[in-house]
Amino acid sequence: LAANGEVWKGTGGETIRYYDENIANLDPQHQNENTKSLALRIAYGPFRYYCGGDAVGSLLDSNGEKVNIEEKVGEACGTVDVSKANHHAYKDAMTEGFLRHIQAKQYVIPVWDHEHIQPDVIQRMVTMTADKSDPVVYVTHMPQARQEKYASESWMQSVSPVSGHVVIKVFDEGRKYSIYVLSAEDERCLVKAVYGPYESGNK
């Protein structure tokens, strides 16, 4: 979908090289590695999975207007079943525009810092997800202090109560998938929780 600021247009082999659109994008003071993130959409049968690294930030187009790279990547990607959150779902990520394009049913947030638990962002992810019957958000680590602080927040009801390694198991030739949460305290990777199976195909 994207790499080094070059984003697929969504059909055929055409791309837009946003760093070439405006010379100001090449100014070292405005260089941002996040806009250069590699973004992938993985397909197996009807199942779709998105992973976009730290794909956030803006670049200038030929008219000097700001272009949100995350939203352009989401537009190229289209709807998916499961999405890894961009940039740890930090406050500059998972914009409304991006979420509207991918319409994922579940999101995985890789967390290694307390600040990666951003209430406004998670609330937005939960609110813009149609199916809330099961956990919508899976975090690799939920700091105890954050869990206690936000325990009464409505969005916490849509966050998996267990955290750890998140594994997506796709089967039946891509028609179904389950989400496993494994222990991350040591190398045993014990199964802590299993969610699903879910039907693939986000319409």
Question: Which positions does each model-derived feature cover?
Answer:
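Cap/insert and terminal regions of metallo-dependent hydrolase folds
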Residues: L26-S37, V56-S158
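Flexible, acidic/histidine-containing loops and adjacent segments that form or flank the divalent-metal
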Residues: L1-S62, T129-K203
